[in-house]
Amino acid sequence: MGKNLTIVMLVFVSMAGWMFGADTGSIGGITNMRDFQSRFADRYNPVTDSYSYSSARQGLITGMVNVGSFFGCFLSSPLMDRIGKRTSIMFWTIVYLIGIILQVTAVPSWVQIMVAKIWTGLSIGALSVLAPGFQSEVAPADLRGTIVTTYQLAVTGGIFIAACINMGTHKLHKTAQWRVSMGINLLWGIITFIGISFLPESPRYLISVGRDEEALQIMAKNNDLPIEHEVIQTEYHVIKSDCEAELAGGPATWPEIFGPDIRYRTFLGLGVMSLQQLTGDNYYFYYGFEVFEGTGMNSPYLSALILDAVNFGCTFGGLFVLEFFGRRMPLIIGALWQSITFFIYAAVGNRALTRKNGTSNHRAGAVMIVFSCLFIFSFAQTWGPAAYVIVGESYPIRYRSKCAAVATTGNWLWGFLISFFTPFITNSIGFKYGYIFAACNLCAACIIFLFAHETKGLTLEEINELYISGAKPWMPRPKNLGNFTKQQEEVREKSRGVQGESAAHLENVDGEEGIEDSSNDISSTTSSDGRAKPESSYHDQEEQFA
């Protein structure tokens, strides 16, 4: 039962990312379809019989989904605290379906497209907080990175399939060109809604609202063990103790997430999600058609499809990279790699792409596409998935929904700014734009080195202890962390030979001792008010980051 639940979670929770990717991947091609342009573009050239957009209109049509997503992040927090993540995902999926219907039924007014994009963005923003958070809470510590990475894998899968659909529909007649491409997104929303309806709620959420019996049943099913087993009981008591300590002060308020107890991680998450956009990935995904058309390629649709295929294929590597190499080093090395690729891309585009006679140098264009793919090769395995992993696992349960919402707004805010202003910037400085992204990637590498801890293999409770400890991110992890994880692994090894037996035949004496020992460990690291004792003050570290 446990393996089946994990597979279902991977498929259906990650479908929220697929919905986002499908919208992102389709809009670049749709805005260049003849029928769509004839209805929504604001410029017409009778000599060439062609349509085009002003920079402002193109930026608004492409970027307003990010504005909706920005507000969707904030709206997700109070709802998930009240009804849980699972039900919230179902609610926002319905909002997404309504948004797609508004897009497909648009009349010849670009304003309806813009409003529909904002509405759709509300759901995409909320789901970008809910889905990785749900996966982080349900997944076992040793698989959490892989499971959360499937969200980004689904995003890239949605982008790739949307590019394939655009490739097949752009030669259709009239509104079918773009309405089929938009309308197919209804299918992804329906699949997500049906799949999520069969999933259990997060055990941590259930424990936090006093539904302990339900939480125990779900934890037992997830691990293929009876409720009485020492692994389940040990994990339950640790989560229960952690929830009681964190919730002792009542629900967190918005000002509290910027207070001394948590602001370091609030700004870290905000920074990581902002930098994910500032790496420059959506420069290719939103405007890939225009980018490759500018290199002189005969079929920009095909060129964009190749880039999306590289993105999707390389994200599979991220499933293993983050578990084998952790979070810090892939992010640092990835940012440095991406900086180099953008620098070369910009240099070739600026100096070699256009000949003196005004024609395109196709060899230079090919080099630019190669380095675009090399950028995606890195991003898809590092910054694409790792940013969601860090945000999903960094916050205590009392602050988690609000901190994750604030962090994710950074992604959507910069997504809008990049998508809206890119037409203006490229019209002004052309491919020199790449130098800006090269510099941003260098900054990203420095920020990760200075402020992000390595959290590979730790439970969510241990990650909280790590940040409280005051340890420097670039120093070795404190030795007193990881005891609970090691204890779990030892118990799991012993339990493999008895998983198929009846619970009546299990010996729980050692389990009770394990629980008592775990409780003692917890009490030794908590103060009289139930909060964790820091080994040293970390306020100085927070002030440095803030």
From Swiss-Prot:
> Where does the record place Low complexity bias?
520-529
Location of the protein in the cell: Membrane
What is the protein's membrane topology class? Multi-pass membrane protein
Record SUPFAM superfamilies: MFS general substrate transporter (SSF103473)
Q: Where is this region: Disordered?
A: 486-546
Q: Which residues lie on this side of the membrane: Extracellular?
A: 31-58, 109-112, 166-179, 286-301, 350-363, 426-432
List the carbohydrate attachment sites: 357
Phosphoserine: residues carrying this PTM: 528, 537
Cytoplasmic-side positions:
1-9, 80-87, 134-144, 201-266, 323-328, 385-404, 454-546
Glycoprotein in keyword set? yes
Per the record, the major location class is membrane
Molecular function terms, GO-annotated? carbohydrate:proton symporter activity; high-affinity D-glucose transmembrane transporter activity
Q: Which domain of life is it from?
A: Eukaryota
Biased region (Basic and acidic residues) positions are: 487-496, 530-546
The residues that cross the membrane are: 10-30, 59-79, 88-108, 113-133, 145-165, 180-200, 267-285, 302-322, 329-349, 364-384, 405-425, 433-453
Where along the chain is composition biased (Acidic residues)? 509-519
One GO biological process term is: carbohydrate transport
For this UniProt record, the keywords arranged alphabetically read as follows:
Glycoprotein, Membrane, Phosphoprotein, Sugar transport, Transmembrane, Transmembrane helix, Transport
Keyword Transmembrane helix listed: yes
Function (record text): High-affinity glucose transporter.
Entry's family note: Belongs to the major facilitator superfamily. Sugar transporter (TC 2.A.1.1) family.
> What name does this protein carry?
High-affinity glucose transporter ght5
| Organism encoding this protein | Schizosaccharomyces pombe (strain 972 / ATCC 24843)
Lineage from the top down?
Eukaryota, Fungi, Dikarya, Ascomycota, Taphrinomycotina
